[in-house]
Each structure stands twice: as structure tokens, then as C-alpha cells.
Amino acid sequence: MLEKLKKLLSKKGDNFSTPAPVSVDDYLEEIEEIPLTPVEEEKVIIKVCSIEDEKDAVNAIVMAEAGYIVIAKTPNLEKEIDDEFIEIIRKMRNEVAKFGGMLLALGDEHLLITPRNVVIEKLIKEKKEESNVTKENIEIKEEKEENSE
């Protein structure tokens, strides 16, 4: 990786090819639209708290069971937790599952606790066929390689 950066930044890196210019129309064709249907219902309230002990965990669970989405700051889940805190998270997971909610880790320092009426879905992008711009760039690159041989 370091060698590639050195080549790229050195004056000898003239052999790198630049992509062909892209027209605005071609660029706009490449943009993927994610199909979403807007949902207009009552306001969603998100509660933010910190979990340092079992009492804080119980409060967060009660808020989620009452219908709030809870984002809870925790000690660093990679570096700073001990067996006691792991047991607290295990109890939280079991209690949240009892009322049909979800408990998810958001990075190393946050938990997301949802009530039963909240569904979390992973966004899956559909693969589009290679765009015309990509095809053109490949063709130009192949032509340059043929000409250089």
C-alpha cells in the first residue's frame, strides 16, 4: 500500500490513466434511487441515556417497554467492560425479548433498544447492470493497453 502511494505521489507516476469525462446525463443515470414510502404517523420520541449499572439498565428497558426508542451510552464494549457489565447486557437482552423489542449494539459505546412496534430492516441495494459510463471507461482502458503494446 505504501509503495502504491509513493508511486502515485512521485513525479514518475505519469503512467496512470485518467477516466473519460462523464456527461451530466450519464452521471444522473448512475444514481440509484432507493424506493421508500413515507410514513406519516404520530411523533416518534427517542430517549437518550447512559447505562453504567443495573439501575440504569432497568430504566432504559422500562422506557423501551413504554414505547420509546432508547439510545444508551455504555462503557466501551470492546475495551472497558467486565463480567458484571456483560451480565447486565445479557439480562437486558432477555427482558427486551420478553416484550418483543430489540437490543442492538451501535458501535463500541452505544446500545439501541426498541419497543415492539419498531422494526429495523437492513437496507439492501439492488445491483444495477454496468452503466454505460463504466463500459466506456473499460473500453478506453482496453484501447490504451492495445495501443501501448
Curated annotation (Swiss-Prot):
It holds the Pfam family SepF. Residues 130-149 are annotated as: Disordered. It comes from the Archaea. Residues 130-144 have a biased composition (Basic and acidic residues). This is Uncharacterized protein MJ0919. It comes from Methanocaldococcus jannaschii (strain ATCC 43067 / DSM 2661 / JAL-1 / JCM 10045 / NBRC 100440) (Methanococcus jannaschii).
